[in-house]
Amino acid sequence: MKEFFSIGEVSKLFNVKISALRYYDEIGLLKPEYKDEQTNYRYYSTQQFERLDTIKYLRALGLPINKLLDFYNSQNTNTLLHLLKSQQVEIDRKKKELERIERKISRRITHIEDAVNMPLHQISKIKLPAMRVAYLQHEYVLGHDIEHSLAELRTHLNVNEDIFIGKIGLSISAANVKAKQFDKYSSIFMILEDENEKTSSEIIFPSREYLQIRFKGSHPEAEPYYKKLLAYMKEHHYEVAGDSIEITLIDYGITNNLDNYVTEILLPIK
């Protein structure tokens, strides 16, 4: 049986990069059996194979190099047990985080497919469940920079950065809707998801009936669709029952093509 193996041979046998084996030697994690003083070549024996197997196994479990060094420096079974239990907790945390991300992605896919496939310019009567929202009463006039309002929402409500990837909307007060002043928004809000933490100024949009319409474009193109909704309400003897909800479902966060923007107006009715 062969007594010594070159670093290249060990690299091939264990599918470990030569640079990694050199690094393990430098930090004292895996020393070769001996090093040729003239050539500086490293040679390994089968005694190093078992440790290398263990290193590969623990690295596959996600244990960092510094933790492996702690284990081998202590030469204590309890140390390894503690490391594995700690790693188990970390893996469970990461798994829950990945599940949360998966739910967000699934919802986003559903929202985009719904925005792409639902007919435009048609009025529908729908009932929506209650919605948690981060809400800021803030006047916004068409033509002003909405990004400043979004930044203020983030700062004022101490909302985490990641939850801005979702449904951000504007509202026109019921009084302004009735007065047909469609260029003055009274508030900006963000629909929160179930796993989002409570914010400092969270409110609930109650479950209620709405008239819904979707159209190509964004907030500057909304006025004729408000007029269309009001005409429909008059024809069917409905009344405005609250502030509007106006959300751009497909915007610059998804596409650079303005022609692909889709916006939804929800008008509470009674």
UniProtKB/Swiss-Prot annotation:
<dbReference type="Pfam" id="PF06445">
    <property type="entry name" value="GyrI-like"/>
</dbReference>
<dbReference type="InterPro" id="IPR011256">
    <property type="entry name" value="Reg_factor_effector_dom_sf"/>
</dbReference>
<feature type="DNA-binding region" description="H-T-H motif">
    <location>
        <begin position="7"/>
        <end position="26"/>
    </location>
</feature>
<dbReference type="InterPro" id="IPR047057">
    <property type="entry name" value="MerR_fam"/>
</dbReference>
<keyword id="KW-0805">Transcription regulation</keyword>
<protein>
    <recommendedName>
        <fullName>Uncharacterized HTH-type transcriptional regulator YdfL</fullName>
    </recommendedName>
</protein>
<dbReference type="Pfam" id="PF13411">
    <property type="entry name" value="MerR_1"/>
</dbReference>
<dbReference type="InterPro" id="IPR009061">
    <property type="entry name" value="DNA-bd_dom_put_sf"/>
</dbReference>
<dbReference type="InterPro" id="IPR000551">
    <property type="entry name" value="MerR-type_HTH_dom"/>
</dbReference>
<dbReference type="InterPro" id="IPR010499">
    <property type="entry name" value="AraC_E-bd"/>
</dbReference>
<dbReference type="GO" id="GO:0003700">
    <property type="term" value="F:DNA-binding transcription factor activity"/>
</dbReference>
<feature type="domain" description="HTH merR-type">
    <location>
        <begin position="4"/>
        <end position="74"/>
    </location>
</feature>
<dbReference type="InterPro" id="IPR029442">
    <property type="entry name" value="GyrI-like"/>
</dbReference>
<keyword id="KW-0238">DNA-binding</keyword>
<keyword id="KW-0804">Transcription</keyword>
<dbReference type="GO" id="GO:0006355">
    <property type="term" value="P:regulation of DNA-templated transcription"/>
</dbReference>
<dbReference type="GO" id="GO:0003677">
    <property type="term" value="F:DNA binding"/>
</dbReference>
<keyword id="KW-0678">Repressor</keyword>
